[in-house]
Amino acid sequence: MPFQKHVYYPLANSPEGPDASAIGAAPMAFVPPSAASGPLPFFQFRPRLESVDWRRLSAIDVDKVAGAVDVLTLQENIMNITFCKLEDEKCPHCQSGVDPVLLKLIRLAQLTIEYLMHSQEFLTSQLNLVEERLRLSLLDYEQSKQLLTKQAGEIKLLKEECKRRKKMLSTQQLMIEAKASYYQCHFCDKAFMNQAFLQSHIQRRHTEDSHLEYNTKAQTDRLQKEIDMLKEQLQLTRSQLESAQHSHAVRFSKDYEMQKSKEEDFLKLFDRWKEEEKEKLLEEMEKVKGMFMREFKELTSKNSALEYQLLEIQKSNIQIKSNIGTLRDVTELREDHLPCPQDFQNMLQLLDSQASKWTDRFQVLNEEHSKEKGQLLSHIEKLRSSMMKDLSADNVFYKRRVEELGQKLQEQNELIISQKQQIREFASKPYSSISELKGTPLTRQTLEPKSAAPTTPMTASATQNLDGASSLTMVHEQVFSSHILEPIEELSSEEEKGRENEQKLNKKTSLRKPSSTSPSPQELRTNLERELGNKLRSFGIGANIQGIPCEILNRSLKAMQVARHDLAKQMPDIQQIRESLEHQLICKMEEKVSLSSDRHHVPSMTTFPPEEVPKATQLPHKSRPLVRQRTVFTDKVSVPKLKKNTKESHFLRRFPSTKTPPFSSEEEPDEEDLLHAYLSPDSLATAATQPPKSSMSHFGKSAVKSDTDWTEGSEMDDSDFSPKLTGTSITIQTDTVETMALPQGSGNKAVPGMNPADTVIKKESLQELKCTDADDEDWDISSLEEEKSLGSKIEQREPPPAKRDPSCTQVQRAWGPVNPREFKEEGLHENEPSTLKSNLVTVTDWSDVLDV
């Protein structure tokens, strides 16, 4: 090949002589990258504008180059020789130009060299094109060869398939032509013309096999059924495995994507670090290069000064000769009479030492850079391994955590299902059994004030009914349902006698079981506080938190409103059900109020001190009418502001806190757990002793609030477990029932000094005092402090009656023991015209739990 390493070398059998071949063996020029892309443009000689580097030419030994075939030296000087300009060159001695004949010869040689360089580039480009075509043709040949072998294999397979198909077709044709005249024996290879011959053959030759055939058929059928069943099971397990594999693949792909993103981020950081290191290295290289250039400039300046001195010496010593002779004399003088050869040697040694010094320094810098790079790479690998270990540990921890949470969630779901099943069982039983199951001991304790047993607080099972996975809105709804009272319905005389007999029979069991099984009130309080604290911690509420933030409250209330709207969409007739139930309840209350007012008329009464109340006014336990509790959901009824006065005038005939819940009666046992209320006579006595604080207009405003506003405010107060709700939703109902039962409870004996109109005014003022703002957002104020402050203000404004029991001026906590004397001394006081206060059911003061 004439081209080796993109350099043109002429062939050995060229017509030129050995000198020409030696000269032509020099590499002319490297092939530019644009030469292989296509044909070269039109050739044109370049102008000569470069000056001759005489110093470089004088350093070349031509005989040595020709003898050693030093192509590299020729390659280094080919551009200067080809494109140098000799017209302006003058003799340093005579200052005359170059000989024209010699100049013409040199120009022809330059043009020849340039043309040869152009030819070399063109031939190199053509050679590259031919090599590329050859490579493509070889690739096509390999592909065609592979395709040919593949097609030969396919042809062979097709031939075999054709042979097999031919055999199959021939056998099928024979079977079709034979039709029914061909009968094959199942036990041997013999064939018969008809079925009779086949049967005789089987009886004669295969008697035992025929009996076995029937048995084998049954076995094969049974095995076939088992195989089908196993196939179905296999298909089911295969589908399960595919679904599990798909989920695993999805999880693995997610993990892989996360890991890949992390690796990409890490690679980006690594690339950024590499770029920074490259920039630093380039800066150092630039600094070293600048230093080299400065030293090189200094050396060139010194060298130029020495050359100038040398030229001055030559001008003074050499005579003027002809043009050609002067050139030869100059070279001879430079070779023979070199001024100061010791200085040149010193200069060369200095240059060599500096070059070796800088090369050593450069090598040291490269080694340091490689060491730092290796250290950083090892550090990166360590970081990556540690990161992977941490990620694996975190994954194991989170998987374990997810499994634990899943188990807890499953247990809670099972608990919820069991509780709902119990509620359904209670709902399916008769009403009397439900009342006995729910709170027979508790209601009997409230109805028999002679017993000295303390009021049993709410057990920890009520708090356990709250689901740990439910939201805060469900907690508010459950707490709201616990504060709803049941109306009191009077019984007939026969029912009273039957109930009294039943009470006498079950008195010991109903009263002794709570006292024997239930612990003391202090222990119950501590247990309830502990259970409540654990449940609040499970909801993420710490012990130091004094309330729920407004954002969480608003969000939970919005979620509750959305749920109610969805329920209203699912049941379009829910509003009609509410209105019908409300109408029925109001009608019943009006009938009972009218009947009681017609039969009993109360004359003007006089008040007695608490110690001087007659025995007739103090109602004993046996003379008090028994009550039957009925589960009724209560709520406020929105009243327009224009009818406020009419509503206030008929306040005794209306039941102001009556409303159906936002769900049907069928869903009541499944949706919410009703919490039993407990007796708090001291709190009722305190509420009765407090005089009115504001006018009746305040109660009207509080009663006029809309449906949604009341529910939001009441639930906000219920979440704090403060007794404010008992003032709004319980006391009004209590006073209304008291005014109904007043004539019956007094036993038709009038107490002098009391006016029914005054009683109504006092009851309305008491209702106004108990109505609180439902939209109050101050969750941390205790109801106990409010009632104490109200009691102190009342004492400042109006002096209490003489010989008043001090226990009535402050609210007794529901957790404390009940004083038996309070049941006996409870009668008609100044602000207590009703005798049924001890029989009413109130809500436990939950604020005590939060205060602790």
UniProtKB/Swiss-Prot annotation:
Basic and acidic residues: bias regions: 494-505, 785-806, 821-832
InterPro entries, sorted: DZIP1_N, DZIP_RILPL, Znf_C2H2_type
Composition bias type Low complexity, residue spans: 451-463
Chain positions of all zinc fingers (C2H2-type): 183-206
Outcome when changing residue 520 to A: Loss of phosphorylation by GSK3-beta. Decreased interaction with GDI2
Positions where Phosphoserine occurs in the chain: 210, 520
Region (Disordered): 434-463, 489-524, 597-623, 648-672, 685-726, 772-837
Gene3D superfamilies: Classic Zinc Finger (3.30.160.60)
UniProt region (Mediates interaction with PCM1), positions on chain: 1-188
Feature: compositional bias, Polar residues: 512-524, 686-697
Tissue: Expressed in testis and undifferentiated ES cells.
Effect of residue 520 to D: Phosphorylation mimicking mutant. Increased interaction with GDI2
Mutant lacking the gene: phenotype: Male animals were all infertile. Few spermatozoa were collected from the epididymides of the mutant, and no motile spermatozoa were seen. Light microscopy of the mutant spermatozoa showed severe morphologic abnormalities, primarily absent flagella as well as residual cytoplasm and abnormal heads.
GO biological process, one term: cilium organization
Molecular function per GO: BBSome binding; molecular adaptor activity; zinc ion binding
Record carries keyword Ribonucleoprotein: no
Keywords: Cell projection, Cilium, Cilium biogenesis/degradation, Coiled coil, Cytoplasm, Cytoskeleton, Developmental protein, Differentiation, Metal-binding, Nucleus, Phosphoprotein, Spermatogenesis, Zinc, Zinc-finger
Result, substituting residue 14 to R: Changed cilium assembly. Adult animals develop myxomatous mitral valves and functional mitral valve prolapse
Regions of compositional bias (Acidic residues) in chain numbering: 709-720, 774-784
Function: Molecular adapter that recruits protein complexes required for cilium assembly and function to the cilium basal body. At the exit of mitosis, localizes to the basal body and ciliary base of the forming primary cilium where it recruits and activates RAB8A to direct vesicle-mediated transport of proteins to the cilium. Also recruits the BBSome, a complex involved in cilium biogenesis, by bridging it to PCM1 at the centriolar satellites of the cilium.
Record text on subunit structure and interactions: Interacts with DAZ1. Interacts with the BBSome; recruits the BBSome to centriolar satellites of the cilium. Interacts with PCM1; localizes DZIP1 and the associated BBSome to centriolar satellites. Interacts with RAB8A (GDP-bound inactive form); recruits RAB8A to the basal body of the cilium and prevents its inhibition by GDI2. Interacts with GDI2; negatively regulates the interaction of GDI2 with GDP-bound RAB8A. Interacts with GLI3; retains GLI3 within the cytoplasm. Interacts with CEP164. Interacts with IFT88.
Protein name: Cilium assembly protein DZIP1
Species annotation: Mus musculus
Name of the coding gene: Dzip1
